[in-house]
Amino acid sequence: MASFSLSILVFFISALVLVPQGFAEYYLNPAYRPPQTKPPVNKPSHKEPPVHKPPHKEPPVNKPRHKEPPVHKPPHKDPPVNKPPQKESPVHKPPRKEPPTHKHPPAEDNIHF
């Protein structure tokens, strides 16, 4: 019987250690504690409608156009080359006779009688 009472004693001590609140006021309602911080209030976010602004345009600035001064270049001349002038040799070409078109050949050239 000593082992039975010892096991019951160990059971109760372990129950007190393992259960955090133990056997304290199990059946009572917990005491009211006011909240430490205020609860958040859900307000709809107030967004202003977008305001249409025209694009910003800077006024035109009157600046004179930049003109480059004209550049005077001397005319390009090839350097003189010291070569004797070459004369073209005359080429003799016999005058070309064109054959008659849409005509009968002359009688002396005609071999058909």
Curated annotation (Swiss-Prot):
Residues 29-113 are annotated as: Disordered. GO terms for cellular component: extracellular region. It comes from the Eukaryota. GO terms for biological process: nodulation. Sequence repeats lie at residues 34-38, 39-43, 44-48, 49-53, 54-58, 59-63, 64-68, 69-73, 74-78, 79-83, 84-88, 89-93, 94-98, 99-103, 105-109. Keywords: Cell wall, Nodulation, Repeat, Secreted, Signal. Residues 45-60, 67-113 have a biased composition (Basic and acidic residues). Residues 34-109 are annotated as: 15 X 5 AA approximate tandem repeats of P-P-[QVHRTA]-[NHKE]-[KEDT]. Residues 1-24 form the signal peptide. Expressed only in young nodules. Residues 32-42 have a biased composition (Pro residues). InterPro entries: Proline-rich_CW_protein. Its main location: secreted. It is found in: Secreted, Cell wall. Belongs to the plant proline-rich protein superfamily. ENOD12 family. Involved in the infection process during the plant-rhizobium interaction. This is Early nodulin-12B. It comes from Medicago sativa (Alfalfa).
